[in-house]
């Protein structure tokens, strides 16, 4: 069974929408290009004839959510919410594992660090058009990273490394990582954020 949360407000929203659809219509939650940097999540109507034998069905009050076999592991820990604020109402879908499958706690250190970088660090850097990649982890526990995009050449990269990335990684990998170092040959240009 998948660990997907659809909040009460989102369930009410879906039930209202589905009430205007043909009998037996449910919803489908899916990921296009799962496991890649181009992964995109979506929700669509799912008429009875579109249900596949390999789909996972998650029943809710008044409807079911169907998830295809390929999307399922990438929707682990996903949350669908319907939020109303002064700007209006919108459906939000957060799927932290859409771009990269969740790794187990006993996976090799390099896989666990890469997972945290891709799912927690890079989404924050993306707002500035930047990203960071793990180059290697040395024998003495130093994570070597390389910045790209808007982070390359940015005057704030040292602060981002020390106060953001290093603090986050050392906090999550106590006793396993000792430091985080930048291996980027920074080239300041129009692409640089600051």
From Swiss-Prot:
Cofactor: [4Fe-4S] cluster
Pfam families for the chain: Fe-S_biosyn (PF01521), NifU (PF01106)
Protein name listed in UniProt: Fe/S biogenesis protein NfuA
Keywords: 4Fe-4S, Iron, Iron-sulfur, Metal-binding
Subunit relationships: Homodimer.
One GO MF term attached to the UniProt entry: 4 iron, 4 sulfur cluster binding
GO biological process annotation, one example: protein maturation
Family classification: Belongs to the NfuA family.
Chain residues that bind [4Fe-4S] cluster: 151, 154
Domain of life according to the entry: Bacteria
Gene field: nfuA
Record has Transport as a keyword: no
Function noted in UniProt: Involved in iron-sulfur cluster biogenesis. Binds a 4Fe-4S cluster, can transfer this cluster to apoproteins, and thereby intervenes in the maturation of Fe/S proteins. Could also act as a scaffold/chaperone for damaged Fe/S proteins.
Cofactor remark: Binds 1 [4Fe-4S] cluster per subunit. The cluster is presumably bound at the interface of two monomers.
Gene3D superfamilies listed in its UniProt record: Fe-S cluster assembly (FSCA), HesB-like domain
InterPro entries, per the entry: Fe/S_biogenesis_protein_NfuA, FeS_biogenesis, FSCA_dom_sf, HesB-like_dom_sf, NIF_FeS_clus_asmbl_NifU_C
């Amino acid at each position: 069974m998948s660990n997907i949360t659809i909040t009460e407000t989102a369930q009410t929203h879906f039930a209202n929408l589905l009430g205007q659809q043909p009998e037996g219509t449910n919803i489908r939650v899916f990921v296009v290009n799962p496991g890649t940097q181009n992964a995109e999540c979506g929700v669509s109507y799912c008429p009875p004839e579109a249900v596949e034998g390999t789909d996972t069905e998650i029943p809710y009050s008044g409807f079911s959510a169907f998830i295809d076999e390929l999307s399922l592991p990438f929707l682990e820990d996903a949350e669908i919410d319907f939020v109303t604020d002064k700007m209006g109402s919108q459906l939000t879908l957060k799927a932290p594992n859409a771009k990269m499958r969740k790794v187990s706690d006993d996976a090799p250190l390099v896989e666990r660090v890469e997972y945290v970088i891709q799912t927690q660090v890079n989404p924050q850097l993306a707002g500035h058009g930047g990203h960071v990649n793990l180059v290697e982890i040395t024998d003495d526990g130093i994570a070597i990273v390389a910045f790209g995009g808007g982070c390359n050449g940015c005057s704030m990269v040292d602060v981002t490394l020390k106060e953001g990335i290093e603090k986050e990684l050392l906090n999550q990998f106590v006793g396993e990582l000792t430091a985080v170092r930048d291996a980027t040959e920074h080239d300041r240009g129009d692409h640089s954020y600051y």
